[in-house]
Design a protein with these regions (language model features):
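Interface amphipathic segments
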Residues: 1-196
Length: 196
């Protein structure tokens, strides 16, 4: 580091807590002109399991996050995200623009603009999404859980009396290679005033 730039690196060589087995995982970053550029990596020996590059900008009480689409890797595979993706978070405000991760027919979207929602919300929408895509980070050699996720999970009114609405199916659900069939989550808040 000097008076203008700050660079850092932190990571682990290996962490084993059965069935979790993290291999070489590290975070590198550099701060320049109030912009923090982060590079998160996880490797299984020589294979890149996970790679996410992003930039964070702090402006007063607001945090802006952008995920770089170049070399976005989840579960050893290249993924796509729109170049103009943007996440803005403040004390009582969040906005997720074009935060849509996709690969072939798999999609995961985080949004604050789900059409059927009438109150402030933050939602995660799944389409043909394989659970192992994220869980491979915790054990790249053995599937902790598998299944195809469809549906949505929404946090309602996240800055006050928070509630939730969820309609998720996980088809062909397995945990540690044990088949469990279909898992369904269908939940909604009775009244937002019951929370808080």
């Amino acid at each position: 580091a000097d008076s203008v730039d700050l660079k850092f690196s932190a990571g682990i060589a290996e962490l084993i807590y059965d069935p979790i087995h993290l291999k070489q995982t590290y975070l590198e970053g550099s701060l320049k002109n109030k912009q923090l550029v982060l590079d998160f990596n996880s490797k299984n020996d020589t294979v890149q399991v996970l790679h996410i590059s992003s930039s964070l900008v702090f402006q007063k009480d607001t945090l802006k996050l952008h995920i770089y689409p170049e070399n976005l890797t989840l579960n050893n595979k290249q993924w796509e995200i729109p170049e103009d993706n943007n996440i803005v978070i403040a004390e009582s405000y969040a906005d997720f623009q074009n935060v849509l991760l996709s690969r072939n027919s798999q999609k995961l979207e985080i949004s604050t603009k789900i059409p059927k929602m009438k109150v402030d919300h933050i939602g995660i929408l799944f389409e043909n999404f394989q659970l192992q895509t994220f869980l491979s980070f915790f054990n790249p050699d053995e599937a902790l859980a598998k299944g195809k996720v469809e549906g949505d999970f929404v946090i309602l009114n996240p800055y006050a009396a928070t509630g939730l609405a969820a309609n998720i199916d996980i088809k062909d659900f397995q945990v540690l290679s044990n088949p469990l069939g279909m898992l369904t989550l269908d939940a909604s808040s009775k009244s937002l005033s019951e929370y808080g």
